[in-house]
């Protein structure tokens, strides 16, 4: 439903998550909650935020579509800052193998894993990838996600990487959600470069990066920096080349073993370092010092039955922590934002306040958009969600249940 002016009034809580940059350490506990609050928006932009009586004194309420939210909490739209939602095929057999005890890396080493999805994605046409991608965006949108990051990395050649990124660009134009695109050509080494990882990195740098940049639709470059995949030196070489082409930088770091990926991300001042299940204490300190967002993916640790990233230690050390789904066909075939929040609180020892911050303003910072989205602040885009309950604390408490009642995206109203 479209309306140029919307007023949410008498909300049990307006959870503002105020600010225009990532919140670090103890700052993550400050949600800026307004009780009996109101939010006014016009032409897709937030114009007034505050106690209901104050907002009503400053607007002509009769000009607005009113939503009375006496028993509802109102939050910024969620930002899912790490996904791989465009892919062909599925890997349900590999999930069964992992249940029998096979490790993620052992499956990858014998031709499964990412290369398995690469084959299916290369065989998929644009329309099929688009249709499946739209379905996944719809699922995320229904759970309150208004901005999503999506990675390529299942083509591992120029042609298919471009197809993945063009699908994301097209969905960004056609779907209510915003899609922030990331080039992840260095996700694995394809069979045609087996045993020649340095040559593959050269190919990425010399041929693929310039062609991706020419598309003018891709914001980030990412790399899977991991033992047995891309070394620290190879990762740094690729990321420095990407920066030369004016990409912002991300890293998959320290997911499988302690590898020094977080330290590299800090030295390169990446926007975010992601996964971090096996980050070192030194890596934590350097991420905090460098201001790199630590994007943690509890659904993946759950799906792989691996130890969770040390969120509590990171926050206490002054890191800015974000949470994301890591939706992908292999290590985490789930987009369950509600389950992710519960896992973060129960197993990673994050408080409900920290989890909300991690999925809003810090998620926005992880995609370089904290000045536009991620908080209910005057001048920001009108990306707002209403819950079915009167407090944000129901998010981890009502485990695994979708509590989103209404989504407002760019000032347009969607009833879930």
From Swiss-Prot:
Cofactor(s) annotated in UniProt: Zn(2+); Fe(3+)
Bound cofactor: record note: Binds 1 zinc or iron ion per subunit.
Organism: Parabacteroides distasonis (strain ATCC 8503 / DSM 20701 / CIP 104284 / JCM 5825 / NCTC 11152)
Database matches in InterPro entries: Amidohydro-rel, HutI, Metal-dep_hydrolase_composite, Metal_Hydrolase
Subcellular location, record wording: Cytoplasm
UniProt keywords, alphabetically: Cytoplasm, Histidine metabolism, Hydrolase, Iron, Metal-binding, Zinc
Similarity comment text for this entry: Belongs to the metallo-dependent hydrolases superfamily. HutI family.
Entry's EC annotation: 3.5.2.7
Name the record gives this protein: Imidazolonepropionase
Enzyme class: hydrolase
Cystine residue pairs: none
